[in-house]
Each structure stands twice: as C-alpha cells, then as structure tokens.
Amino acid sequence: MSLREICSQELVEFKGNKRGIIVNIKREAPFEEIQEKIINKLEAYVGFFNGAKISKINSDCLTDMEILELKEGITSRFDVEFVEDQKIEENSNFPTKYVNTLRSGENIEFEGDVVILNDMKPGSKVLSKSNTVVMGDINAGAKVVAGGNVFVMGKIEGFVHAGAEGNEFAYVVAGNLNPKILQIADNIAEAPDDEENYESESEISPEIAFVSNGRIVIESYLSKLDK
C-alpha cells in the first residue's frame, strides 16, 4: 500500500456483531486525532448510539492505557456501555435478526428488526416488518423495505422504503442520502440527477428523511435533534 493510500484510508470504522459495536482503528495516528474522530462519529449519530453496547476497540497502535482513556472519555460523554468483559445474555424473545454479510442476490425476510453488519451488495434485499439498521452502505441495486424506520451508518444509493405498511411517521437516517428511489409510506421521492457525490469522512453530516405535509423532506439529522 502506498503512502497516499495509507493517508487516505478511513481512520476509524464502526462495525457490529451480536455482542455490540466494534470500533476499528484502521491506521496509525496521534492519540488525540483518533479520540477526536471517534467522538465526532458518536456525536454525528448520537440518536443511534444512545444506549448502545460497544464490545471492543481494535487497534495495533494504541497502548492499553490509551484504550482505557478512550473508554473513559466515551462513557463520560455518551450513554454507551462497554461489554467486552461481560457475558451478554441472549433473549430469544427479542425479535432482532443479525446478518453478517448479505451477498448479491441474497434476500432476507423477517418479522422483527433486522441488523445488517456490513454493506448491502447490489441485488441484495431486506424485507422487515419492523426497523432495519445497516452498519455500512446500501449500494446501488440493493433494496430495503421496512415497516418501521431505516437507519444506515453509511450512504444510501439503492432503493429504500420505510413505513411500508402505511406508517407516515417512519423515517430514514443515513450518513449520505442519495437513493435511486426513497419511499416513506405511500410518498415517493427520487434523487435529482445533479446530486453531489458521497462526502468525505471529514464532511459527513447525517441526514434524515421524513414526511411533512404529504411530501418527503430531507434535513440535517443533527439540526433535527436540536429542534
């Protein structure tokens, strides 16, 4: 890997598994920069991470003391819990389906919540009667249909339908909303042809789409939280 490729690599990546959120430090950087990136991501998605469980911080460059300092800084500012040293009891009555990888052409259909732990490949499809969370991107050609809300950590370039059973109070949140078609209940919107490309990591500002006065409105997620 060239120096340019290393420098352009995303510094902090959030993934997930059945135990909780995994924070991956992708390359070496000063501790203060790593801490700032993690805090910024948590603040950007504060509504999603409130009450979340973080199972691990993966890093080849941080010392044990620095990781401990990161944990203390995170728990002092956010309603999150580190659970790597605890046993998480699984409740079979809690209707959530976790999917590690959704391959091209693969379909998932579930009555409860669905959590996709990686990107959705073109041709993949999720049908959920409740909420759907995607820890990566919904790529062009992928499709999500949810009876409830849809929350995406990355970008949306595929088809998303929230409130599929007629719930006009449903909403869609994503790091970047650029879907081929976005539908909430019976309201449909298509992205304009001149939609800007996916923003760089430093410019990410999560967006929320919801129905207002019979049409789909897209606003900054953070400004919506402040209202």
Curated annotation (Swiss-Prot):
Spell out the subunit comment.
Interacts with MinD and FtsZ.
**What high-level taxonomic lineage is stated for the organism?**
Bacteria, Bacillati, Bacillota, Clostridia, Peptostreptococcales
**Family (UniProt):** Belongs to the MinC family.
Biological processes per GO annotation: cell morphogenesis; division septum assembly; regulation of cell septum assembly
Q: What does this protein do?
A: Cell division inhibitor that blocks the formation of polar Z ring septums. Rapidly oscillates between the poles of the cell to destabilize FtsZ filaments that have formed before they mature into polar Z rings. Prevents FtsZ polymerization.
InterPro entries in the record, alphabetically? Answer: CAP/MinC_C (IPR016098), MinC (IPR013033), MinC_C_sf (IPR036145), Septum_form_inhib_MinC_C (IPR005526)
In its UniProt entry, what is this protein called? Probable septum site-determining protein MinC
Keyword annotations from UniProtKB, A to Z? Cell cycle, Cell division, Septation
